[in-house]
Structure formats: C-alpha cells, structure tokens
C-alpha cells in the first residue's frame, strides 16, 4: 500500500488495488468514517495498533512509513531472543526427561546388582536439581505468557522488572527505537512523548512515555525528567549528547544499534551457559548409567 501511495495514486485507487472488500471501505468513507478507523477495525496485528495511534498526529502516508519502521525494528530483539532460547530449553528438557527415565525405569531394575549407592545418589541429586530448575522454568514461562497476554498484569509488574538490568536494557531499546522513528518524522519532542504515552499496546514504552509527557505538561524540563526515569545508563549519556548536538535522531540510532549488539551478547552468554549446564548433566548421566551397566559384569568377575 505504501509503495502505491509513493507513486502518487489517489486513496480510492489504492483501496481498490489493495483490498478485497474495496466497495465496503469506499462506502464507509462516503458515510463519513475515517480511513484509519476502517483499516484498523478488528485488526489484532501490532502494526495496525501502531498505525492507529500515529495517524492521529500525522498524515496517513507518514504514519504508515513510521509504523512499518517501528514494527520491523521492535520485532528484531524479540525474534532474536525467542529463536535463540528455544534450542537450549529443548536441550534442558531433554536432559531432564532422560534423567527421569533412567532414575524411574532403568535404575530400579539395576539396584539388585549393586551395593554402591554413590552413583544412585548422584543421579538422585541431578533429578532433584533438574526438577527444581524445571519448576522454575515453567513458572517463568507462565509469567511470560501472562506478561504477553494480560495487559493489567504487565502494567503492574513493569516497575519491578525494571530493577533488572537486562529487562531495563530491553525496554530502553524499544523506547529509543520508537522515539527515533517519531523524531525522524519531524515531530516535536513533546508530540513524540504524547504519542508514546498513547501506545497502550506497548505497555513498557507507554510506561516511560506517559510519565515523561505528564511531567512535561507540569512544566518540568526534559533534561530533568530524563534523569528520574529508570533508563539504561548508557541511553541517558547518548540522550544528553543528542540534545546538546541538536541531532538526537542520529544519536539515538547509534545508541540502539550498539544496545542491540549488547543485548544479543547477553542473550548469547545466557544461551551458552544453559547449553553447557545441560550438556554437562547429560554427560554425568551417561557416566552414571555406564557404571551401572558394568555392575553385572563386575559381579561375574568376582564369582
């Protein structure tokens, strides 16, 4: 749709080319409805929710360009995290269920051949450790599901999560991406924070944006407000440099590009730690099972 608008086509022609129900849309337009309300009606995609907010403050073409930029950039971090974390979680679950299988099915049948409890004790300790970690992982997954699907829960828990440096970095990156995209659309700083305060779909960004905008309405200086917000410390440095240089857009872009690299590095370290731990436990399991499998042979040698 954006490509057609860039070619100078009128709205009616673009609607006829892009939508199956063009007649209904055109009829609703003739009845006085706003195009953006028609397009976003019943839509659940994040792009349309962003577009609906932006269209109130800029032209439809500008809003579409800005919404696409925000949507594409903000998806990068989440996609990287969830795609990278999936394999370590699989390895962890595989190791856990292997331990359960051997400790519940294989080991009891081998107990008759052994008087040594050391190997069994080690396996029991592994089972307890993995069970505790598995319960923690399930709880975290449930909390993540609630965080994504229950807006009220997300809104309540954000202030507590911001005490975590990794989450703080993640939210600050999202905020800087959106702010940079809005400033690049030639909006004033106050208008940008007003838009961010209306981004209810992005509760994290809304939390920051609404707080800043409300304090701006009270007459406080932006430089003072920024220092009171729990942003990533590096962001505060870049933001102040950008304000002094009068080129905040470029500085913000430099910041979030560096911050994304830092976030990916942290995620990769977490992934490597999980993989090493899971592989190590699988290795211990193999050694224990190997020792147990040798027990009947050892008994034959003693006869």
Report residues per predicted region.
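Cytoplasmic juxtamembrane interface segments
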Residues: 23-33, 58-82, 197, 204-220
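Bilayer-spanning, highly hydrophobic alpha-helical transmembrane segments
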Residues: 73-146, 261-303
